[in-house]
Amino acid sequence: GYYLAPSEYFDLTLLGDYYTNGSYGMRVESSYRKRYSFNGRLSVRFENLIDGERGLPGYSKSNIYNIRWTHSQDSKANPYNRFSASVNLGSSNYFRESLNQINTPNFLNNTLNSSVSFSKTFRGSPSVNVSLTASHSQNTRSKTVNLVLPTFQGNVERVYPFVKKNG
């Protein structure tokens, strides 16, 4: 594998595995951070799995993957705009079949969840808040995927139309 730090804002890890039966795996991981602005982490994993001997009964070949991304914005960056993401999606059998993910908590976890949201506050009188949120839920046992496409929400500060502005 390789570890690179191309700048002070992010790093990159490239890892690969090769097994004698022809199976292989690749992992790309990166962390990024800009002080007082944002930070996050991205992980992409892919494996090509071969089981058995080619030409014999029981031979199988499969591809599995997992993508994780987290991003958060520092509240000091822009107090009126906010973006955050927590993404975890992949093959339904990734944690059961992966050669590099043999740990009980991940193996027993049956759901992969994701959420991405953006909100904005418009200053003024009255102030207006709007937000968009999208989410994803994946059950690895039943192999069902539920997507909630962007949901819009808007709020307006309470207005008192018959109250004098001065006094």
Feature locations, PLM:
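Outer-membrane beta-barrel proteins and related beta-barrel translocases across Gram-negative bacteria
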Residues: G1-G167
